[in-house]
């Protein structure tokens, strides 16, 4: 147990699927897992452990933003002996080729944040996903015909729709990186995995397209953001079967 997680160590599986939204974690447990139990609800950050096609899996919310993801993923790795966390979430799409609900598989994530400096006194702003986990996800995506778009992603500290000038933020990103999407949690997850010798990956479903200073050109509804992501959820769970 930790101040943020009331589960006993044995209540948490060594593979965790991690949406940001606690209600999405509940949705996954109710619609995809067998014999699941709620093992933590501190701060209404739900964690459920059950089985998917016989594989023991925990689904736990991270909350929004790097500080929240940083706490929950660190504790799972450090105190619950979790080996692998696959983040599943939503993102804004920056590539003109993306469509709503396309699934991005982040190969590496860039952030301007000082998360790594705070956590580990390292001036680090670019961190990779686990190649092993990404390779499994990519193979699984082909096997079950749920395609992914691979690329670099950005991790911001402000919701991009609320930025006064999103173009200035994008212009500060090194020109060779060219992020295809943006979210708010993956850098903390990937860095914690790197720091603690664990594995992490991130799947994102595109819910806003071509965000600019006038807003997105297409956007999913609040209901779609909660429940309209079944392909991504299925891909994460099917990939977990191969871990």
Which residue stretches match the model-derived regions?
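Generic non-transmembrane alpha-helical segments
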Residues: 136-144, 192, 235-243
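Active-site rim beta-loop-alpha module in soluble metabolic enzymes
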Residues: 127-176
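Flexible, glycine/charged-enriched surface loops at secondary-structure junctions
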Residues: 35-41, 145-152, 243
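A C-terminal functional module that forms or caps the active site or interfaces directly
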Residues: 166-209
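Short acidic/His/Gly/Ser-rich catalytic and metal-binding motifs that mark active-site loops
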Residues: 112-115, 161-163, 210-215
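His/Asp/Glu-rich mid-to-C-terminal helical/loop segments that flank catalytic regions of hydrolases
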Residues: 210-243
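Glycine-rich beta-alpha junction loops
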Residues: 22, 92, 154-160, 188, ...
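Metabolite-binding pocket within alpha/beta catalytic cores that recognizes anionic/polar moieties
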Residues: 1-136
């Amino acid at each position: 147990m930790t101040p943020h997680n009331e589960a006993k160590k044995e209540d948490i599986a060594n593979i965790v699927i991690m949406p940001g939204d606690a209600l999405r974690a509940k949705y996954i447990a109710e619609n995809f897992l067998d014999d699941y139990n709620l093992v933590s609800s501190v701060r209404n950050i739900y964690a459920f452990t059950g089985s998917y096609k016989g594989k023991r899996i925990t689904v736990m919310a991270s909350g929004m933003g790097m500080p929240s993801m940083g706490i929950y993923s660190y504790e799972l790795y450090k105190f619950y002996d979790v080996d692998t966390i696959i983040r599943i979430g939503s993102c804004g799409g920056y590539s003109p080729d993306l469509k709503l609900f396309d699934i991005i598989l982040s190969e590496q994530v860039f952030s301007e944040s000082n998360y790594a400096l705070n956590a580990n006194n390292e001036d680090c702003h670019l961190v990779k996903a686990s190649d092993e986990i990404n390779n499994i996800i990519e193979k699984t995506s082909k096997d079950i015909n749920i395609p992914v778009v691979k690329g670099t992603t950005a991790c911001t500290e402000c919701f991009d729709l609320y930025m006064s000038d999103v173009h200035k933020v994008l212009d500060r990103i090194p020109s060779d990186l060219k992020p295809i999407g943006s979210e708010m949690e993956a850098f903390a997850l990937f860095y914690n995995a790197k720091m603690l010798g664990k594995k992490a990956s991130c799947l994102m479903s595109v819910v806003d397209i071509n965000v600019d200073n006038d807003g997105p050109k297409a956007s999913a509804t609040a209901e779609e953001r909660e429940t309209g992501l079944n392909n991504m959820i299925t891909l994460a769970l099917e990939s977990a079967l191969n871990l």
